[in-house]
Amino acid sequence: MDKCEWFSAVPPPAGMQCKHLDPTRDCIRILGGFLGPDDVVREKLKAEIVTTLPSNFGKTLEMGGQEGLCILRKSLLPRLSFVIRTHHPALTSECCEFFDAELVKCLETFAQTCIDGKKDGIRRLPTRHGGLGFVDVRDVAKHAYEASLESSRVSIATPGDAFLEAQAAVKSQQARTEAFYASLLRQLTADDEDAYNLLVDAATNGCSAWLHRCSDWDRPLTHDEVSAMLR
């Protein structure tokens, strides 16, 4: 009941009024996604994301170290990932820009350094390419939405193996963004063999390995370690 909304301007039945069920007049929300006029949905998303993110990032900074990175990777990034997968990019652009800016400020505080130029590229580069994997959500919003939309068009009535095959045939978000990140990798390593070797090593032995398993660490991540990665 706590996650339900009453889709009517008429008050809910008396037996349901003990719960917080405000009548929904301008748009509806189903499984976390808003449905309604574009301008209304855009404002709903801004109200939910933009007004709450500063507090969430602030708590992340208070925790710091390993715990803060875990929250960024396991909680805040997935939250935006859900939004961009379920809403058209035209509706999420402002939320994405705000989130990306807050993310950079948070990481700069962790690393105690300005993240720009090549450091920002490494920050945005996925861990499979040796980067930190803290991607700009605006870079992937279009691809995430298209992959989710195509997947949703596979009918759940499709029998057994045919359903699995149809889902497997859907081009994934990772596949859709691969060309973009391959281009970013080339930009970061152009005429710089040392940079290329560093990222290849990071993809196999460095940040890629431990960032995916940072929750398994038995000690906090220090500011110096984060700073070293960004440099």
Functional labels for PLM-detected ranges:
Residues M1-R231:
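Nucleic-acid-interacting cores, centered on viral/eukaryotic replication and modification enzymes
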